[in-house]
């Protein structure tokens, strides 16, 4: 039996096939995502969700064989994508490199006001809320890899692992919830999210 691993990075997307018993690397595929898109300001570091998902799906599908038992997905932390109630991305991916949190906010910056760092999901969301930039049909935000898993499994609402939630900032690990607004479902530990092509 074999396992597939997908890593959605900032500049590239990688897929591997590993033998579950031996740990042997059977196959590896890496593609540049070339997903950065122009924003309105120089500090914006945003990417095309559609392009990322297309490449990640192509890599995944190219690795599937009859003896694949499980698929694991990971990716860049901190960055966020807004999703509507039907599970569709309604924004670009705001990457961890996005600099909106360093913009002035009163006598400080957006990031410093939250005691956080620019590029963290909570800072990006705070800036967007304060500046009317959250898409009107956005219901949730999540990482790009949580969004990819939701698409693969046919979920309308992404599930976020608490380690990714913690990487956004302003997440209480004890109560497993955000401090403030966010209507997100969290998962703890290692769990099967769902199925893709009967895997």
What are these regions (language model features)?
Residues 1-2, 107-109:
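Short, Lys/Arg-enriched, disordered terminal segments
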Residues 1-91, 137:
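N-terminal glycine/serine-rich phosphate-binding loop of ATP-dependent small-molecule kinases
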Residues 8-10, 111-199:
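Gly/Ser/Thr-rich active-site cleft segment
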Residues 38-40, 103-107, 170, 198-199:
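Short, charged, surface-exposed secondary-structure boundary motifs
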Residues 41-45, 109-115:
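Short glycine/proline- and acidic residue-enriched helix-loop micro-motifs
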Residues 94:
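Surface "functional belts" at beta-alpha junctions
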Residues 98:
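Carbohydrate-associated surface elements
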């Amino acid at each position: 039996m074999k396992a597939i691993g997908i890593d959605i990075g900032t500049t590239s997307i990688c897929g591997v096939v590993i033998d579950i018993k031996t740990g042997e690397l059977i196959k590896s595929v890496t593609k540049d995502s070339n997903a950065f898109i122009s924003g309105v300001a120089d500090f914006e570091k945003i990417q095309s969700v559609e392009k990322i998902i297309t490449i990640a799906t192509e890599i995944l599908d190219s690795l599937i064989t009859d003896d694949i038992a499980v698929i694991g997905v990971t990716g860049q932390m901190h960055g966020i994508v807004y999703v509507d109630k039907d599970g569709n991305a309604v924004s670009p991916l705001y990457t961890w490199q996005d600099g909106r949190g360093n913009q002035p906010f009163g006598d400080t910056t957006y990031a410093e006001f939250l005691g956080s760092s620019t590029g963290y999901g909570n800072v990006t969301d705070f800036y967007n809320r304060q500046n009317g930039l959250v898409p009107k049909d956005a219901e949730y935000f999540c990482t790009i890899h949580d969004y990819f898993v939701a698409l693969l499994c046919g979920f309308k609402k992404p599930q976020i692992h608490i380690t990714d939630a913690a990487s956004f900032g302003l997440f209480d690990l004890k109560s497993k919830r955000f401090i403030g607004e966010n209507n997100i479902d969290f998962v703890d530990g290692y769990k099967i999210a769902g199925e893709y092509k009967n895997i």
